[in-house]
Design a protein with these regions (language model features):
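Acyltransferase
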Residues: 2, 7, 199-225
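Extreme N-terminal starter segment of soluble prokaryotic enzymes
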Residues: 14-20, 200
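N-terminal beta1-alpha1 ligand-phosphate binding loop
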Residues: 19-40, 208
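Short acidic low-complexity segments
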Residues: 43-54
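Short acidic/histidine-rich motifs immediately flanking catalytic phosphotransfer sites
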Residues: 52-62
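Cysteine-nucleophile active-site neighborhood
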Residues: 64-136
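Pocket-forming structural segment of enzyme catalytic cores
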Residues: 104-187
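Short, surface-exposed beta-strand/loop micro-motifs that present aromatic residues
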Residues: 184, 189-196
């Protein structure tokens, strides 16, 4: 059997990308770990500061209440880690509440909690007859999306949430800056389903639970690291 060039010369083989799933107590860390490992990444679940800072990619899952997730994130110094990584252009990806906490604030039961304020906007209760939004749904991604590259327009992703961002208010007027790419979905009223903003990407849905479509999406992210 003929060996590939990389197999003949191991120094030519690419090392797998190191990804840390940040473990701050609020997330499906094991399912995220398994899904990322299937892309070929070297994955570790940890809250270790140095490992989270030095990984090729940092994935921040999130399940539960916005306020509780923010408390857990701050206790684990995750807010500082995310900020430092982004200031250095190091990739970060948020999932579900891990996306929501990237916005300016969350409003639950009339109580407002400050988020990380990477993007303006409020996470509010879904405006729909049936809440939570639980199950499979399509998304409307920009034509030049890197996150959804190779995916059909009718690809479906798995959502479980009662809160969402309904209004995107970040406008970029400087021609030297690239505007974020925003993907939408609809449950009652349209809401933000994903954002691609330089080194910071995020999804409201769970790619780790979204079958082949989710696997392709995670592969796309790993490919940018």
């Amino acid at each position: 059997m003929e060996l590939s060039t990389a197999a003949k010369n191991p120094r030519n083989a690419k090392s797998p990308k190191k990804v840390v799933v940040f473990d701050y107590g609020f997330g499906n860390v094991r399912s995220a770990e398994r899904a990322l490992a299937r892309t070929g990444a070297d994955v570790e679940i940890t809250r270790d500061f140095d490992k989270a800072m030095n990984a090729d990619g940092l994935l921040v899952p999130g399940v539960g209440a916005f306020a509780a997730c923010m408390r857990g994130l701050k206790e684990a110094r995750g807010d500082w880690i995310i900020g430092r990584r982004l200031s250095g252009g190091r990739p970060v990806m948020g999932i579900c509440v891990g996306m929501q906490i990237l916005f300016a604030r969350g409003i639950e039961h009339g109580v407002e909690t400050e988020g990380l304020d990477e993007w303006p906007g409020a996470v509010e209760p879904l405006q729909a007859e049936i809440v939570p939004h639980m199950g499979w749904n399509t998304v409307d991604a920009p034509a030049d999306s890197e996150l959804f590259a190779g995916l059909d327009a009718d690809a479906r992703f798995y959502f479980v949430h009662s809160y969402a961002v309904h209004d995107w208010s970040l406008d970029v007027h400087n021609p030297l800056l690239r505007a974020p790419k925003v993907t939408w979905s609809t449950h009652g009223k349209p809401f933000v389903a994903a954002v691609e903003n330089g080194a910071l990407w995020a999804t409201q849905f769970h790619p780790e639970k979204s079958g082949d479509a989710g696997a392709q999406l995670l592969t796309n992210w790993i490919g940018t690291l």
